UniProtKB/Swiss-Prot annotation:
GO CC terms in record: cytoplasm; DNA-directed RNA polymerase complex; exosome (RNase complex); primosome complex
Descriptive protein name: DNA primase DnaG
Function comment: RNA polymerase that catalyzes the synthesis of short RNA molecules used as primers for DNA polymerase during DNA replication. Also part of the exosome, which is a complex involved in RNA degradation. Acts as a poly(A)-binding protein that enhances the interaction between heteromeric, adenine-rich transcripts and the exosome.
Enzyme class label: transferase
Keyword Amino-acid biosynthesis: no
Pfam families the UniProt entry points to: Toprim_4
Record: residues binding Mg(2+) 1: E179, D221
Cofactor(s) essential for the protein: Mg(2+)
Residue positions binding Mg(2+) 2: D221, D223
Amino acid sequence: MVKDEITTTKYLIHSQINAKGFVEKPDVVGAIFGQTEGLLSDSLDLRELQKTGRIGRIKVDMTNRSGRTKGEIIIPSSLDRIETTILAASLETINRVGPCEANLRVTKIEDVRAVKRRTIVERAKELYQNMMEEFTPESSRMIDEVKESIRRPEIIEYGEDNLPAGPNTPTSDAILIVEGRSDVLNLLKYGIKNTIAVEGVNVPKTVADLTKKRTVTAFLDGDRGGDLILKELLQIGDIDYVTRAPRGLEVEYLDKDQVIYALKNKTSVDKITSHANYNHNQHRYHNKPKSHDKFESKLHEVTSSVNKTDKYSQKNESKQFKQQKNENKQVKDNSKEKTQKSTEKHNETEETHLNKYELMLKELSGTGKGRLYDMDFNLLKEVKVSDIYNEVKNSKETIKNIVFDGIITQRIVDLSKEKNIECLVAVKMSEVVKKPETIKIITK
């Protein structure tokens, strides 16, 4: 394709000609003009179109071999698409060139503007590449520096072992134990800042000490390394919950949904006896709980002791002692009956409170408001849900119960613990990781 054709035309008609004999270029050009003359309307007459410059110079490239002639014909066109295709189709009516039989076939119609666009894109790529190599984008470097300065303080070094940890680890009541620094970084991306890494299979003393003071969840990889760390934690630590990444995955590569799912489905250590039977997908252990084994052991000791005492009694007790024993039994039965009544009364009170909470929440439904109550459920104040946090934080009154038409968040729970609030009642609860045992949380 010649450069001036690209700049002066819209389309190029490419066609192939085969002639049974020896023919030359002038024969082909003459056949094109001669056999298409009068075939189409005057507006599409080739001679007229060439005079007005709407058709360019016809180019023919011929080869003669074994008494036959083959060649390629290129006709530049500045007509529109429809006129160009009609003109191209008319070329296929040519059946003779000079004295020889021939046939002509249009192979393609090339859009010169598309070629220009491709040329522009390729050249733009070259220019951009050169620019990137020659000039360092200052603004990009500035952005990276600012991001790095923000990111760097997020991870702290905690304890005498200088372990990687989230910024809230020193003050948080609940912490997450993970395997490495990358896990801490990944959880920081999703706003989880109460993490600490053990940095290997051997659990450091810093982490072992922390497990005795805080509510601890072990969030470990779903691989062999996670199994080993869990075994170590169960032996030397005092963890409360365990959760795992899906089998074969690591915490550092989990997305936000996977992290939230794992934390929601954590398993209490009380239900665990052997980490080897831990199922990564269901987050549960299949053997009997530890606490049950301990309970059975203690029960066996007590039973043995009682049996020994009974044998001794049977040998030595007199009628008077038997009478005393019957009196003691009666006292015991009376005590048991009182305890049972007390339990029933407590359950009734609990049920009454639940009904009261439901009624209060129903009254607030759709209002977007909340109510603050004291110990005896006397209304202290009614406020908008958006103002509850500030009202509770700044209040000098003794608030014990909060009922509101909204969502319980970690922020509200933390403030309630700080203010010694006993009960939170709301429509639903968001992703709350730390739930203090001193606060009763009720949702719709």
